[in-house]
Design a protein with these regions (language model features):
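Acidic, Ser/Thr/Pro-enriched low-complexity segments and adjacent helix/loop capping patches
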Residues: 1-221
Length: 221
């Protein structure tokens, strides 16, 4: 993080960070990749940045891989219980992060992370009552206008009017209910919408990962 903007997400466990072999590394010698992974386990520097510094891969695809795997890594937190954020204040970013462009829009970066989640990974988060009614939060409608949504996400968001149930939205868009729940989870996690029970007028209180993250980095609620 820098000035409330997300630079990258990484881990000192290179296998957790990148368990597969990206096609970009197909021409890189295995021992060089192993060395880059070993360095990541010590410094946290994403292996792609190390390989780029050694001119084994180009910087542009390296930056794209850093964003891809960082968001994929962070995606695991959205469905995990008891997540707490701990921050260390430093005068400057680690040297390896100096060439990475920060993402000024936390919502945009977070949505990219949420797209990595598959339905089977939702667990109890998939247990939405089909009769529940999604409705925009206080500033949800304004925020959703600034997001770069996919066509499917934009169509889904257009159905939020405070009276349509999840089941009705799925029917209107001819969606499988599982896909509807997965898409809804993204908007709930971002606090764009909240779900109301058709049988109660009590507004549910949500303390999401996004809210805790924004408070921690000093971004407005």
């Amino acid at each position: 993080m820098q000035n409330g903007q997300i630079v990258l997400a990484t881990a000192r466990d290179p296998e957790l960070y990148c368990p597969d072999a990206p096609i970009t590394l197909v021409n890189v010698e295995a021992d060089k990749i192993a060395e880059a992974r070993a360095q990541q386990s010590v410094s946290g520097c994403p292996l792609f940045l190390t390989l780029a510094q050694e001119e084994l891969i180009l910087r542009e695809p390296a930056g794209q891989l850093v964003q891809h795997y960082g968001q994929k890594l962070f995606a695991q937190l959205w469905t995990t219980r008891g997540v707490r954020f701990m921050f260390e204040r430093n005068a400057e970013l680690p040297g390896y992060a100096s060439g990475i462009s920060a993402e000024p829009d936390v919502d945009h970066w977070s949505l990219g992370s949420l797209r990595f989640i598959q339905f089977h990974e939702l667990g109890e988060h998939a247990n939405f009552d089909p009769a529940s009614i999604p409705a925009y939060t206080k500033n949800g409608f304004e925020r959703v206008q600034n997001l770069k949504l996919t066509v499917a996400e934009a169509q889904f968001a257009s159905q939020f009017n405070g009276s349509r149930s999840i089941q009705q939205i799925a029917k209107n868009l001819r969606l499988d209910l599982k896909f509807a729940r997965l898409t809804l989870f993204r908007f709930l996690a971002l606090e764009i919408v909240e779900c109301w029970s058709p049988s109660t007028a009590v507004k549910p209180e949500r303390k999401s990962i996004l809210l805790r993250l924004k408070r921690s980095i000093g971004v407005g609620e």
